[in-house]
Amino acid sequence: MEGPKKVNQIIIKTSQPKDIEQLLAHGAKADKVYIGQNGYAFETISPEGDHFLLHAEEDVSHLELTDLPSLTKDDAFKGLSDFTFEKIVLNVLDQENSRDFYLKIFEGEFPIELDFVQMQGPDLALEPHIAWDLEILEVGVPKDFDLAKLKSQLEAKGVSIYLDTKETVLVLSDPSLIEIWFMK
């Protein structure tokens, strides 16, 4: 890697605040611990430098930095029982271009919230298979979803599309060369 990665932060939300406490009690690596209205949250940085925030709040802006608490382990705890990927923050070469792409193509209906931070670095423009970084955003669609129709709609917006012959996978790339796969 040379310069910043495409992934700035991935924000994960759980509906089970007690799961966060148990992850911390069982020794989950927490680089920063926060407290909010619903309980604890924490940020961890992967060995590859990816930032993950796990929380159970309605609004993460209310989280306050705190010290790692002393928590009691529940031996029956099996892991995070419920979660959603709430938001992905991407480092991009052109913030406005990236934001405009997603608004134009998906008209505000992309299934996960995306945010963009303008950065500089050669790896931000690399093909996905060259660097260890975010390669694909996968979007599941129902079996009866008409990918051929979606292909036509996206091509009408000037987007280059790949659709497999069985019409089960449609692929396009965003300005950062992150592939977006619609899969049945």
What do the PLM-derived regions correspond to, one by one?
Residues I11, A25, L65-K78, E113-V117, ...:
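N-terminal secretory/membrane-targeting helices
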